[in-house]
Amino acid sequence: MFDPHILDSPAVIFDNGSGLCKAGLSGEIGPRHVVSSVVGHPKFKTPLTGANQKKYFVGEEALHRHEVLQLHYPIERGLITGWEDMEKLWKHLFEWELGVKANDQPVLMTEPSLNPRETREKMAEVMFESFNVPAFYLSDQAVLALYASACVTGLVVDSGDGVTCTVPIFEGYSLPHAVTKLYVAGRDITEHLTRLLLASGRTFSCVLDKALVDDIKEKLCYVALEPDKELCRRPEEVLREYKLPDGNIVPIGDQLYQAPEALFSPEKLGIQNPGLSKMVSCSITKCDADIQKTLYGEIVLSGGTTLFQGLDDRLLRELEQLASKGTPIKITAPPDRWFSTWIGASIVTSLSSFKQMWVTSADFKEFGTSVIQRRCF
């Protein structure tokens, strides 16, 4: 029997990303736990440990043991592809990170724009049937990021680890026909930076593994306002120093702006798709002429890959050339944008009016998985 009072409990919020899963409780200012979206399974069974051997490891624990584990990434390019591992990840978040019982509190999960119907229904099925949650809701990541900026109409530029997308939103609803996606994001920029550093001829006293290159990227990379002019600058003007884990200092130059350039020029990675600025312009052009000006005036950045210094200035400069002459353009770059989707979810689930939005276990029992299509949009 469904108890309506359970909807008064703070909701559990999972923001599922290709690189990171963010978990926490409704009404809080940020996620309590941020875990790498990875599950590791032992490569070998060791007879000595026997029954005590863990069957799998999650997040950072898996990454630290990567030599003896087979690593699985259950979310690829924003979409869940490994369901068994995803369940393990959610179980870990409920029990070990948050320390809550899944059947005690409602659960809101975020989803990418254009999430396939079968994926949405499977998420609901797993939550209700495997975890016995009392109530569930699916919410678009871009819409939530816009809510975090106190807006209901605007265009969200969201770039995380696996996918970059531009999502126009009108009065709280995304406009699916105008969403554009680019499969160049944080992971690709890290890989590109690795290749550029190796090709630079510099010697590194440490192995350039993903964690190290991620750190270089996050600390030193930037988006050039005019990449052609950047190329003409004297080497000493662009050189930055990076301290390796062994204490050695290595100078790094042009690679620091060349790697993120792939967001604006995907052809650098052999991908024949429009770059970020053209994506925004294309998304807005596909919308009703009446709201195009409003969308240009409320562009919001979201996701960790939009944190590069100079990205907002470059985007603004290029959009001024693409938009109709005299169109006012405003780009908002919230400082906490790497988890603005989670913040938006925390805000929306705290509203008393949200209670009527939940899909309850009773609804699921009565209507089955299709209830998600009707109620979560």
UniProtKB/Swiss-Prot annotation:
GO terms for cellular component: actin cytoskeleton; cytoplasm. The keyword Metal-binding does not apply. It comes from the Eukaryota. The keyword Cytoplasm applies. Transmembrane segments: none annotated. It is found in: Cytoplasm, Cytoskeleton. Pfam families: Actin. Belongs to the actin family. This is Actin-related protein T2. The lineage of its organism: Eukaryota, Metazoa, Chordata, Craniata, Vertebrata.
